[in-house]
């Protein structure tokens, strides 16, 4: 098995123009793997720590030179000589070297960049695609995309409290679903223009029009789906990411768009109303990460009819997910590799979720890069769903293009389950 010859880190930029970490892993047989880590805007309080320099003279304090230095001077020395195909040992070595619960010494961004680059180097050494290296011959399911086409909350400068309004194309193949979504996206742009609304795009490639009520985007999306020639719910469904932790204060949900302060029960009733009125198949972070009792009620109320995805509440952490499963919280988990900070721990979380019957949604972050690792990961683990932004901005499109390549490569072996991924 090829051993690690060298590990190098560098500071590069993400899609928001902020510094992030890139790592390269060199093997003795000449193989090389490279990976760049993303960064989030709305983050769970228990996420692994993204190490920043906090030097106001560089990048307004957002530099990552310390994380890069940790790769070049600390991590590299420990990994040289280890077998690249032994991902568990590589990751375990870095985690133990860090020695903290949230990877705050070396930085989750440093550890993750090396972890993902190691997997890429190993795949290159074997001469196989990344998805096949990670998942073996069972890796053949293309994910149904949840595409963020209207932004609110922290992702936009408008009155909307909810962070993401998504379309979910349900064709018979990934390629066809992508086409359907593109046609809805461009129709949506035309509708927004006709209403005199802003069609500039945000961090994730979605529109951020000035809409006054949290329900308004859902009505416009239904209109766009119909005008594009599709049937809402049958051809193209809807999904929400509320990022509710962002508007949860003192036990209440502060909906500024509606001018209301809701209790957990009232918030659940509002979500039930939206599900009754619109073809919603998935709700992410419908309640705050601090409102576990509310989450239990939400799951009991809506869990048999819609997918309830835990992001901030689980932060891709296998221990927290196991606790949530035991308590009957949610029925799906959003998987963000940089929330936990290593490939091994990410795969552990996915395994625990699937064993418990929870769905997994592989996800990007709002600060992305050209790296397409999550596209391969979604196929490798047969997650069945991916969230990687809208139908604009190269940092988002790169993932969709990679999935098109994978579907073509798999040929007749490729699976695309569409709406079946959301059936309760």
Swiss-Prot record:
InterPro entries: Enolase, Enolase-like_C_sf, Enolase-like_N, Enolase_C, Enolase_CS, Enolase_N. Its EC number is 4.2.1.11. GO terms for molecular function: magnesium ion binding; phosphopyruvate hydratase activity. It catalyses: (2R)-2-phosphoglycerate = phosphoenolpyruvate + H2O. Pathway: Carbohydrate degradation; glycolysis; pyruvate from D-glyceraldehyde 3-phosphate: step 4/5. The keyword Cell inner membrane does not apply. It is found in: Cytoplasm; Secreted; Cell surface. Binds a second Mg(2+) ion via substrate during catalysis. The gene is eno. The active site is at 204 (proton donor), 336 (proton acceptor). Its cofactor is Mg(2+). Pfam families: Enolase_C, Enolase_N. Belongs to the enolase family. (2R)-2-phosphoglycerate binds at residues 163, 336, 365-366, 387. Mg(2+) binds at residues 241, 284, 311. Its main location: cytoplasm. GO terms for cellular component: cell surface; extracellular region; phosphopyruvate hydratase complex. This is Enolase. PROSITE patterns: ENOLASE. It comes from Dictyoglomus thermophilum (strain ATCC 35947 / DSM 3960 / H-6-12). Catalyzes the reversible conversion of 2-phosphoglycerate (2-PG) into phosphoenolpyruvate (PEP). It is essential for the degradation of carbohydrates via glycolysis. Keywords: Cytoplasm, Glycolysis, Lyase, Magnesium, Metal-binding, Secreted. GO terms for biological process: glycolytic process.
């Amino acid at each position: 098995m090829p051993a690690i010859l060298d590990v190098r880190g560098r500071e590069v930029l993400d899609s928001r123009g902020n510094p992030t970490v890139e790592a390269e892993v060199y093997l003795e047989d000449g193989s090389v793997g490279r990976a760049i880590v993303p960064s989030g805007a709305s983050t769970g309080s228990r996420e692994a720590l993204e190490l920043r320099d906090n030097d106001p003279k560089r990048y307004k304090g957002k530099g990552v030179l310390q994380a890069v230095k940790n790769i070049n001077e600390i991590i590299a020395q420990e990994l040289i000589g280890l077998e690249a195909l032994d991902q568990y040992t590589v990751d375990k070595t870095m985690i133990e070297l860090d020695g903290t619960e949230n990877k705050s010494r070396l930085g989750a961004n440093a550890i993750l960049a090396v972890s993902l680059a190691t997997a890429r180097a190993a795949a290159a050494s074997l001469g196989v695609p990344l998805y096949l290296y990670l998942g073996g011959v069972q890796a053949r399911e293309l994910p149904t995309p949840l595409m963020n086409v209207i932004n609110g909350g922290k992702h936009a400068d408008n009155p909307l409290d909810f962070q993401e309004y998504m379309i979910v194309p349900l064709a018979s193949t990934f390629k066809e679903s992508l086409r359907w979504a593109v046609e809805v996206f461009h129709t949506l742009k035309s509708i927004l223009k006709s209403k005199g609304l802003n069609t500039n795009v945000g961090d994730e490639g979605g529109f951020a029009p000035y809409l006054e009520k949290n329900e308004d985007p859902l009505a416009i999306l239904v209109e766009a789906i119909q005008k594009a020639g599709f049937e809402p719910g049958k051809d193209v469904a809807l999904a929400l990411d509320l990022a509710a932790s962002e508007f949860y204060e003192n036990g209440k949900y502060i909906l500024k768009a509606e001018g209301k302060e809701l209790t957990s029960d009232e918030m659940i009733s509002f979500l039930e109303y939206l599900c009754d009125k619109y073809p919603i198949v998935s709700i992410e972070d419908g309640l705050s990460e601090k409102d576990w009792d509310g989450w239990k009620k939400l799951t009991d109320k809506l869990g048999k009819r819609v997918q309830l995805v835990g992001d901030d509440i689980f932060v891709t952490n296998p221990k927290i997910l196991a606790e949530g499963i035991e308590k009957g919280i949610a029925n799906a988990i959003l998987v963000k590799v940089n929330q936990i900070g290593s490939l091994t721990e990410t795969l552990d979380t996915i395994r625990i979720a699937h064993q418990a019957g929870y769905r997994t949604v592989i996800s990007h972050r709002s600060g992305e890069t050209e790296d397409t690792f999550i596209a391969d990961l979604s196929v490798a683990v047969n997650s069945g769903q991916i969230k990687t932004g809208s139908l604009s901005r190269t940092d988002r499109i790169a993932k969709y293009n990679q999935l098109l390549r994978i579907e073509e490569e798999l040929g007749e072996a490729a699976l695309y389950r569409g709406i079946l991924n959301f059936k309760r």
